Regions:
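Juxtamembrane interface at the ends
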Residues: 144-147
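Conserved N-terminal beta1-alpha1 strand-loop-helix module at the mouth
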Residues: 1-101, 106-134, 149-152, 159, ...
């Protein structure tokens, strides 16, 4: 694996596997258990995204997630900067409709990791200017979490990856079968919900995703080396 260094946060291992939580998709499986198993399987970023929870419950869950992820993976909180600060998370994932990246950077400081969901090359370039550390692009494929959304495909992944010097994280319908495709298109990682939450064995699911990404990542590096020879 390769390590990517930003100017503001610590070290982000690439290719990155981000597990986005959804306790409803997890069903009877305790979310804490699923998160821990996902980390054991290779998830190095956990994004807490439980938008229906009131602040007190989200904070309590965030504290538990921080305990599980400490010294094991990065922890991001979706949208809620107050919860990021309250539970000591590593940063925030900002949705397209969320606060401006520059405001989040001002609130959380220069050491926080900030991801930004972007729909276009122009938005990705603006996210970089405003202080984002990575951009999230999708849905790449059809996904049950956003059934009405039109998939953007791997072409947009490639275009954004070639336009900004930030890691591009692909989301939406990612599985072990297509994870390599998005990595070869230029993504620096993937973010998944149901591929792990809905799996009978979350650890095995994470391992399969990690393996698929790793193989495609090595292929990319070899192609780059040959091109530069």
């Amino acid at each position: 694996m390769t390590t990517f260094m930003t100017s503001r946060m610590g070290r982000l291992r690439l290719p990155s596997l981000c597990f986005v939580t959804d306790r409803k998709v997890c069903g009877d499986k305790p979310l804490e258990d699923v998160v821990s198993q996902a980390i054991d399987g290779g998830a190095n970023v956990i994004q807490l995204r439980e938008k229906d929870l009131p602040a007190a419950d989200l904070f309590a869950l965030g504290v538990r997630m921080r305990e599980i992820t400490k010294n094991r993976s990065l922890l991001l909180i979706n949208d809620r900067l107050d919860i990021v600060q309250a539970c000591g998370a590593d940063g925030a994932q900002l949705p397209e409709s969320g606060l401006p990246t520059s405001v989040a950077r001002w609130v959380l400081g220069r050491h926080a990791l900030l991801g930004r969901s972007v729909p276009s090359v122009e938005a990705a370039k603006q996210a970089e200017v405003d202080g984002a550390d990575m951009v999230i692009v999708g849905p790449v494929f059809e996904t049950s979490s956003k059934p009405k959304a039109t998939p953007v495909g791997t072409a947009l992944i490639k275009e954004i990856a070639e336009s900004v010097p930030l890691p591009v994280i692909a989301i939406g319908g990612i599985t072990p079968e297509n994870a390599g495709e998005v990595i070869r298109a230029g993504a620096a990682g993937v973010a998944v919900i149901s591929a792990i939450c809905g799996a009978d064995d979350p650890r095995a699911a994470a391992e399969a995703l990690t393996q698929a990404m790793g193989e495609a990542w090595r292929d990319r590096l070899m192609e780059r080396a040959k091109a530069g020879a």
